C-alpha cells in the first residue's frame, strides 16, 4: 500500500503562524499528510504587525538560504512518496527552487517575489504560480512576461485582481473567493499529477 501523498508547507517570514496551521488543517482534510518545517528559530513566530522585525531577522540570519536547505532535506528524507511543496512569499521562492528536485511531484508558489532572482531555474515538475495584481517591490507583469518567455513546459501562471496576502485569512487583503479558487486549482493539478504518475506503474 502506497503512503499518502505529502505536502510540505514553506512559510513566510512570520514563521509557523495561524495561517500555516489553518492551511495544514485544510490539506489534511483533503487526505494528504502535511509537514510545516520551522525555518526560523525554535518557537519563533511573528504577527503580521511585526513585519519589520520579522523581515530584519529573516534577512540578518539568511533564512532564505537556510530555509531552502531545510526544505530540501525534508524532501530527501521522504523520497519514495509523492511530494508537493506549497510556499508563500519567501517560502514560494523556496518551493520554486525545489521544483527541480527529482523527488518533487509538484510545487505551488503564492506571491513569490524573489522568483525574479531565479529566472534561470528549470522546473522538473508541474509548478503553479499565483501572483497578485500589484507588488510594491517589483513589477509583477514584467516578471510574468519574463517567465512566459522561458516557455517552461510545466509552468502555469495565474495573476489575480488582488493584493499580496489574498490567500491569508489573517491578512486585511484576504480574498476568500480567490483563496478557494486557488485551492481548487491546486486540487485539480495534484489529482491529475497523481493519476499520471500512478498510471505509469500499471
Curated annotation (Swiss-Prot):
Task: Please give one Pfam family short name.
Answer: DLH
In the UniProt record, the signal sequence range is none
Q: Which GO terms describe its molecular function?
A: hydrolase activity
Q: Known InterPro entries for this protein? A: AB_hydrolase_fold, Dienelactn_hydro, Dienelactone_hydrolase-like
Keyword Ubl conjugation annotated = no
Q: Which keywords appear in this protein's UniProt record, sorted alphabetically? A: Hydrolase
Does Hydrolase appear among the keywords?
yes
Give the similarity note. Belongs to the dienelactone hydrolase family.
Protein name (Swiss-Prot/TrEMBL): Uncharacterized protein YczH
Q: Which gene encodes it?
A: yczH
Amino acid at each position: 500500500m502506497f503512503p499518502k501523498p505529502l505536502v510540505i508547507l514553506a512559510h513566510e517570514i512570520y514563521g509557523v503562524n495561524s495561517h500555516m496551521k489553518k492551511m495544514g488543517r485544510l490539506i489534511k482534510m483533503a487526505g494528504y499528510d502535511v509537514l510545516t518545517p520551522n525555518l526560523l528559530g525554535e518557537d519563533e513566530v511573528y504577527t503580521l504587525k511585526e513585519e519589520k522585525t520579522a523581515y530584519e531577522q529573516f534577512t540578518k540570519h539568511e533564512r532564505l538560504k537556510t530555509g531552502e536547505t531545510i526544505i530540501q532535506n525534508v524532501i530527501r528524507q521522504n523520497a519514495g512518496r509523492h511530494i508537493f511543496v506549497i510556499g508563500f512569499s519567501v517560502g514560494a521562492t523556496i518551493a520554486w527552487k525545489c521544483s527541480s528536485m527529482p523527488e518533487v511531484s509538484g510545487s505551488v508558489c503564492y506571491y513569490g517575489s524573489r522568483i525574479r532572482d531565479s529566472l534561470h531555474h528549470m522546473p522538473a515538475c508541474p509548478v503553479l504560480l499565483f501572483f497578485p495584481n500589484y507588488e510594491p517591490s517589483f513589477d509583477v507583469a514584467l516578471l510574468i512576461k519574463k517567465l512566459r518567455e522561458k516557455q517552461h513546459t510545466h509552468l502555469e501562471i495565474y495573476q489575480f485582481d488582488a493584493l499580496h496576502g489574498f490567500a491569508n485569512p489573517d491578512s486585511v487583503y484576504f480574498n476568500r473567493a480567490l483563496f478557494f479558487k486557488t485551492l481548487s486549482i491546486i486540487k485539480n493539478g495534484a489529482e491529475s499529477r497523481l493519476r499520471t504518475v500512478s498510471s505509469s506503474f500499471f
